[in-house]
């Protein structure tokens, strides 16, 4: 069953980039709107944020259903999200800026939503690199701390999305609200866990 779920995840996550490749290869850029370059960037970024959001939602669902063995599926989703983020950044650098790195730095400094997006990208990159079993073992407890930053990367990604579209849309606000709820739930869970440990420690001393 776990193998079947993995296949479903990979097929679904491959869908967006496969569709985009088909559109570009077919030459039918009319499906990308009036500004294909902007649409490609937004499509890739939206796909990354969607997959990341699904990853955290499924994590909560698996926890509530008491199916911890399914949590390993989140790793594949996380790596796919990072893959789309890399494509999103590359599309911006290549298609929008023409590989002009000095302009990239200038844009990064002058545009707040790019700074927020860059921080989220950095967090996701570190998480992706640390998904290697060897590094996970070497990092010990720091691996857990690093991956807790994923919740903040999700929120930063949602803020980046809302800010970059410039106009308030239903999808951008929905993603922002869901991201805030997921982060708050994670922080509440950590608070309860630490409170429980503190209570146990005091009880042991008594």
From Swiss-Prot:
GO terms for molecular function: electron transfer activity; FMN binding; heme binding; metal ion binding; oxidoreductase activity, acting on diphenols and related substances as donors. GO terms for biological process: protein repair. The keyword Cytoplasm does not apply. It is found in: Cell inner membrane. It is a multi-pass membrane protein. Keywords: Cell inner membrane, Cell membrane, Electron transport, Flavoprotein, FMN, Heme, Iron, Membrane, Metal-binding, Transmembrane, Transmembrane helix, Transport. Part of the MsrPQ system that repairs oxidized periplasmic proteins containing methionine sulfoxide residues (Met-O), using respiratory chain electrons. Thus protects these proteins from oxidative-stress damage caused by reactive species of oxygen and chlorine generated by the host defense mechanisms. MsrPQ is essential for the maintenance of envelope integrity under bleach stress, rescuing a wide series of structurally unrelated periplasmic proteins from methionine oxidation. HAMAP family: MsrQ (MF_01207). Binds 1 FMN per subunit. Binds 1 heme b (iron(II)-protoporphyrin IX) group per subunit. The keyword GTP-binding does not apply. This is Protein-methionine-sulfoxide reductase heme-binding subunit MsrQ. Heterodimer of a catalytic subunit (MsrP) and a heme-binding subunit (MsrQ). The chain crosses the membrane at residues 7-27, 43-63, 77-97, 112-132, 142-162, 172-192. Its cofactor is FMN; heme b. It comes from the Bacteria. PANTHER family: PROTEIN-METHIONINE-SULFOXIDE REDUCTASE HEME-BINDING SUBUNIT MSRQ. Belongs to the MsrQ family. One of its GO terms (cellular component) is plasma membrane.
């Amino acid at each position: 069953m776990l193998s079947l779920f993995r296949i479903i995840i990979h097929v679904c996550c491959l869908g967006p980039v496969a569709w985009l490749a088909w559109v570009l290869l077919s030459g039918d850029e009319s499906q990308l709107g009036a500004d294909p370059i902007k649409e490609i960037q937004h499509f890739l970024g939206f796909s990354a944020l969607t997959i990341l959001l699904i990853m955290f939602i499924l994590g909560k669902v698996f926890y509530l259903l008491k199916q911890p063995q399914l949590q390993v599926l989140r790793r594949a989703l996380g790596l796919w999200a990072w893959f789309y983020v890399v494509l999103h950044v590359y599309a911006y650098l290549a298609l929008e800026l023409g590989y002009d790195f000095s302009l990239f730095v200038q844009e990064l400094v002058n545009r707040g939503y790019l700074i927020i997006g860059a921080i989220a990208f950095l967090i996701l990159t570190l998480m992706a690199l640390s998904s290697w079993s060897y590094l996970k073992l070497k990092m010990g407890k720091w691996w857990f701390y690093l991956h807790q930053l994923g919740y903040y990367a999700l929120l930063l990604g949602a803020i980046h999305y809302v800010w970059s579209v410039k106009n308030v849309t239903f999808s951008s606000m929905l993603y922002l609200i869901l991201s805030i709820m997921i982060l708050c739930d994670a922080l509440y869970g950590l608070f309860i866990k630490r409170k429980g440990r503190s209570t146990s420690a005091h009880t042991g001393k008594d």
